Amino acid sequence: QTLVNVRLASLAGWQDNPRLARRRDEAQAELGSEGRVLIRASGTEPVLRVMVESADAGRSRKLAESLAEAARG
């Protein structure tokens, strides 16, 4: 499991980020039934929590960083 915290200026509209949505769908498709992707907003600070679970730690880390970059971008 890999967790990346992505600090943003504001969480407003993060769910509507098409780049993040596309990358999330691609990551989940890559993992298939062998892993999962979870992205949620922190309840206490302007941070997105990006979590990727997979048996392959390197793959989880790579996908989580890619999702974090999409969230920033």
Regions inferred by a protein language model and the residue ranges of each:
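Phosphate-binding and adjacent anionic-ligand microenvironments
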Residues: 1-73
